[in-house]
């Protein structure tokens, strides 16, 4: 018996009943060969129109030809592919003509265009026919490779999805395989469009990002081999990456993101390419925020489709199709009516719980709760009842418990471990112990050993992965989690418990939404393991009936668009979708609000009993009220005929997706707000309403706000953190100040805050740019926008954090090393950078290269010689100094630009210009002539060049404009150029009060003062009008004393620049506070008075004469110290005349601090820890041991050093060797004989002290040649020794004579054996061992 269809002529919808008689079917594998592919099945893949002629036959139209097929013939054709499948007793294929349905609908007075299929027969659902995967074309079967047959719900929907293009809505319980419904619709579209499918796009929309991410991973693996590209477009996606969507076939997005994007794509053809729109969890229409957004987005897509298909070729045109799935709801027909249009009525299919693959048992438990008991205490009492519920309903299988808060998750897990144990065996315990050893969280590790775990967003990612894997494989019997897991991670369980139906949102407790409840209980049932599952909801006795009603699917879905109509009306007006009241009403008719207002007007505040005309009048009145609100803020313009035009402000609000309350907040700006006030204003925006202030976060936030022992935020707030606005403000400042926040939940909040904050700050800056009299606030808004994008304050020292591969840790290391500007980083040696950040080469070269390829700007400001009393003409020039270097490589993105802003003391924005880097790459400059009007307060103008993304590239200059009759007509222009880290103080703030004006002028003067100047100490009342030049330009500051470490780094750079290899030895410098002010005078050697030797008989008068001669020569030498020149061993070339001694003073190897100290102690011994550049080149340690073999030096260069008399064993100082010319006169003036031997000893002592301060440096690339001694000198010295028979040991050999300069190396003789015979045995005991100057 063939089941007839019937038209239901009520004013709800038309229903097509496709329920079938009970039948049993056996399944066997099916092969899809060419022979088995019947003509009937082939006809289903083409476009067709069908009309029902009689009960027993239907008309099939294919390619213009018609064939009549009886129901029995159709049945045979359908089952011809597999003879093993038992057909039903009677089966009818009812294919309906869409035009006939349309005519019938127009003839009847009703508001519905949809057809509904009610499938509720339990026996039919259990034993009905299921379709094999081979029903679809072979090239797409890999999408369903995980199963050979579609389930009953999928099989029933396949006929409408695969063989027609009508809009489709499925209402089925959770866990019934609704994802396959979308995949069948995708395959239908691919069958219609030839490869490579470049002109079609598919949009999948889900309420949350977690579902989009799951679907992206799933479909990328399934449809990737077929040839489709998938792209995820959510709130985490950067706006600069949207060009990738142009090459994507399937786009996963959320309603909010798609709404924001389509507001920008009015003229873009990308939206017009969308041919399939998939809506998951469509029952979120009842949610207040997401529901309104989803409703507007679908209505907008319908409008775009209706406008675009008019210009398309009707033969090749593919209509836009909507496919939506929903949980069990009673009024799913209303959704189908909403998605339908006059030409394509939608199909609605309803499935009951009996068709669920895993049967779900739903239990609602009510617990008593007094009115005095808080929600926190009630939630705590439920923790002690969980053990009994698990024991009753779990059957020893995995259990998932949902809690409202993170703290509640941990508390419930801890209590359960005390009440029950879930370890089954020793092996089970060992596996749990192994998992616990890999857990970082100590509390989680403790409970995991008892078979209980917890999972929420605050848990470390690695710990979450371990917990998820343990639960999936069955090692973890009980898992506690928050409700966010129900939306994000797919962890099915046999038993699901919802502990309390209240959760803490926006500072108050609220009931879970129906979507949240359905998602949580939808986790019950594992198709691969279970045939049944259980869901338990724990709630109050007072709300028990509510959730029983909800689980039965009796809650009607209502629209929430009327609560947010004002923002969406503004968006549609900005897109020119709505131009007048008549068009606005037409747009309202395309919404779900209109469908439900006709059926339930009382819910929307309309009177009962209104007809269609009355309801439309009420909707028109609602539109006019919201349009007046938009007009009052200047977001739209309305004329007398009630035509609408968007304003620039209204376009900004629509473009940046700004709430209406936020727009009202922006209109309260006075124009003199500081940076701190703008941060506070943005923190109060409605976009942060979902940020929660948790009790366990207050301590961390208060520490960030005020703490004496730690780094705090830049602008501390008064009192403690008590509101969510204060929390947002604190987190913004902490992140901009590079203050580490270790709390994971706060880190997630920061990510959300900066995502919204960047958008809000950009909108605020463009909003203030439209107003000429708010220069100060506009400039601070530009700076704040850059701060949000770079995540740094505008005066931050952590500018290196903006470079690639440098995070907070490495940026802190560079700040500690003094690298706080891009210029300092660029001037630092690459190897030194690697030492600072502890990285291997070529990391330093990469950092320097990145900085070198950043844009470098300069500004030139020239006033033309056309002086007037009220106006002045100036020429502005912006130079890109390294534009040739940037032709090859650029660090900044192509979208980088600078904003040129000029303002005066009247807070007027004189000039604004956006300059793209791409325009500067051509010629390297940008020039513009502008006219400046004279301000009433002063003639100063402030010029600012603000980078769009980088901190450290901004330029600020202040100019004094000359006008006729001005006091400063002939004054010099005061300029300031800052190439890094400008704006150390706030942009000046103006006010009407005299005191505020004075503060403004002071701030402007601060801008004019250069970096190396300070404000003078004059107490002038008006420093702009006084006669002191220092009041306007400042007073130069003294240069700071450079530290020992700075000198050490400079010396390290110098040595590194000339050294080809790393030094073999290094002398570590001791960084102590005391070493900076060491008085080297304390280390001067004071010789003891000479004692006459009994062996020498020298007359007293000779000694007195000798001592007097020494003092005389010492005085002459000190008198000419100021005019002495510096000599190198290579030679100065000039000889002293008239026997006047000349003292050499070489200080090239001294550090800055040593130079300062040495100047104060002229006669003190100089001690340095600096090895110098000359120490390491051509140096041989082995040859130093033969320092006594100096005879080989006596035969060379005898002409330059003549008549210099030394004791043979007397150590020769470096100064005496290198400055031989002027010391020669001193020694030739003395006659050395037998009686003056002691005189020579005394003179040597004084001489060694005298020449300690004056040393020469041996160049690192030269070897010291032995040209120190003349033959006469050596001969005279040996003769003197033989005549006196005095021991060769001299007093200068004493180790106490450390004042001798020893910064010299002796060249080892080439033939040591030959030279060694020229020495006495005593010579070997007097070896010169000194190596480093000043050490011994």
Curated annotation (Swiss-Prot):
One of its GO terms (biological process) is meiotic cell cycle. Pfam families: DEAD, Helicase_C, Sec63, SNRNP200_wHTH. Residues 159-347 form the Helicase ATP-binding domain. It comes from the Eukaryota. Residues 646-961 form the SEC63 domain. ATP binds at residues 172-179. Keywords: ATP-binding, Helicase, Hydrolase, Isomerase, Meiosis, Metal-binding, Nucleotide-binding, Zinc, Zinc-finger. InterPro entries: DEAD/DEAH_box_helicase_dom, Helicase_ATP-bd, Helicase_C-like, Meiotic_Crossover_Helicase, P-loop_NTPase, Sec63-dom, WH-like_DNA-bd_sf, WH_DNA-bd_sf. Residues 388-589 form the Helicase C-terminal domain. CDD domains: DEXHc_HFM1 (cd18023), SF2_C_Ski2 (cd18795). The keyword Transmembrane does not apply. One of its GO terms (molecular function) is ATP hydrolysis activity. It is an enzyme of class 5 (isomerase). A motif (DEAH box) lies at residues 280-283. A zinc finger (C4-type) spans 1016-1031. Its cofactor is Zn(2+). Required for crossover formation and complete synapsis of homologous chromosomes during meiosis. Belongs to the helicase family. SKI2 subfamily. This is Probable ATP-dependent DNA helicase HFM1.
